[in-house]
Amino acid sequence: MDNALLSLTHEQQQAAVEQIQELMAQGVSSGEAIQIIANRLREAHQNNTSENNS
């Protein structure tokens, strides 16, 4: 399991869903949209983690 994604608040989850839906409305497949948003969330989590460890 991906701990970074498990720790999302309800608001963050809702924002992710909305971003996925927006990508799908632009013609991106659902799987690709989920992957794009998941990667963005992982990157943001890694950046936050590295900033907190500095």
Swiss-Prot record:
Pfam families: UPF0181
InterPro entries per the UniProt record, alphabetical: UPF0181
Family: Belongs to the UPF0181 family.
Listed name of the protein: UPF0181 protein APL_0863
Species of provenance: Actinobacillus pleuropneumoniae serotype 5b (strain L20)
